[in-house]
Swiss-Prot record:
<dbReference type="InterPro" id="IPR002052">
    <property type="entry name" value="DNA_methylase_N6_adenine_CS"/>
</dbReference>
<dbReference type="GO" id="GO:0016430">
    <property type="term" value="F:tRNA (adenine-N6)-methyltransferase activity"/>
</dbReference>
<dbReference type="InterPro" id="IPR007848">
    <property type="entry name" value="Small_mtfrase_dom"/>
</dbReference>
<protein>
    <recommendedName>
        <fullName>tRNA1(Val) (adenine(37)-N6)-methyltransferase</fullName>
        <ecNumber>2.1.1.223</ecNumber>
    </recommendedName>
</protein>
<dbReference type="GO" id="GO:0008033">
    <property type="term" value="P:tRNA processing"/>
</dbReference>
<dbReference type="InterPro" id="IPR020596">
    <property type="entry name" value="rRNA_Ade_Mease_Trfase_CS"/>
</dbReference>
<comment type="similarity">
    <text>Belongs to the methyltransferase superfamily. tRNA (adenine-N(6)-)-methyltransferase family.</text>
</comment>
<keyword id="KW-0819">tRNA processing</keyword>
<dbReference type="GO" id="GO:0005737">
    <property type="term" value="C:cytoplasm"/>
</dbReference>
<dbReference type="GO" id="GO:0000179">
    <property type="term" value="F:rRNA (adenine-N6,N6-)-dimethyltransferase activity"/>
</dbReference>
<keyword id="KW-0808">Transferase</keyword>
<dbReference type="InterPro" id="IPR022882">
    <property type="entry name" value="tRNA_adenine-N6_MeTrfase"/>
</dbReference>
<dbReference type="Pfam" id="PF05175">
    <property type="entry name" value="MTS"/>
</dbReference>
<comment type="function">
    <text>Specifically methylates the adenine in position 37 of tRNA(1)(Val) (anticodon cmo5UAC).</text>
</comment>
<keyword id="KW-0963">Cytoplasm</keyword>
<keyword id="KW-0489">Methyltransferase</keyword>
<dbReference type="GO" id="GO:0003676">
    <property type="term" value="F:nucleic acid binding"/>
</dbReference>
Length: 240
């Protein structure tokens, strides 16, 4: 996906020149895939450009969405993106670390594309450190925040690189969460998996796990988008 100053979707535009993390395909898949349809209140942890909040607001036309972002420049740009969208009256942004975020409400659903690549070398640029690494939000802190902010029967949807996702799932299980839905994302069929999308619920209220068929962005030619990918993103991507 091109790293342009802005990215146009069917119902909104995401400006991203002030954000370390640009619009990327895997985040778009999370926004289209996450279990949000029946939620009244949704929390987006690590809002970045506001992409996930905007996608969720388009999919769920009545939910109230709170979005938390620690980086000042990303927070202000997300605010501009939200304000210029059709969903500005249902999305509220907070400039805060989620560890310090206090809400009057608990949430039906949490969605997050958290800092990752815990085992990679740190970038020398602080903004990229925040966006790419769990230095600002490790697994335990994230799970503690979710435990505090999610309703007892709530669900959280999360995106990770494959290795990080497997480690996170182990941590979550030890903390009393059950993986109830999983999607493995590939660039194309002959490539290695590169992302895990997961939904968790508290073990005492959880349903049986749904392991969905692998999703490929492209067909084997590496150019043509896979039909299932097109179907998932057709409400958002202009070219679909």
């Amino acid at each position: 996906m091109p790293r342009n100053a802005h990215f146009r979707f069917k119902q909104f535009t995401v400006r991203q020149d002030q954000c370390a993390m640009k619009v990327c395909t895997d985040a778009c898949v999370l926004g289209a895939w996450a279990d949000v349809e029946d939620a009244d209140r949704i929390l987006d942890i690590g809002a970045g450009t506001g992409l996930l909040s905007l996608m969720v607001a388009q999919r769920n036309t009545y939910a109230m969405i709170d979005a938390v972002e620690i980086d000042a420049e990303a927070f202000y740009q997300a605010g501009e993106n939200v304000e210029q969208s059709p969903f500005h009256d249902r999305i509220t942004l907070f400039h805060s670390a989620v560890q310090e975020f206090v809400s009057e409400h608990r949430y039906d659903v949490i969605i997050t594309n958290p800092p990752f690549f815990q085992s990679d070398l740190l970038s020398p640029i602080d903004k990229k450190n925040i966006a790419h690494h769990a230095k600002s939000l490790d697994f335990e802190e994230l799970l503690t925040a979710i435990e505090r902010l999610l309703k007892p029967e709530g669900k959280f949807n999360i995106l990770f690189p494959v290795d990080e996702g497997s480690r996170f799932a182990e941590k979550a299980a030890h903390a009393g969460w059950k993986l109830t839905r999983k999607l493995t994302l590939f660039h194309q069929e002959d490539k290695k998996a590169f992302r895990l999308l997961m939904r968790f619920e508290r073990a005492e209220v959880a349903h049986n796990v749904i392991v969905e068929p692998d999703l490929y962005i492209y067909e084997k030619d590496g150019v043509t988008h896979d039909p299932r990918f097109r179907e998932l993103l057709k409400a958002f991507y202009l070219k679909f």
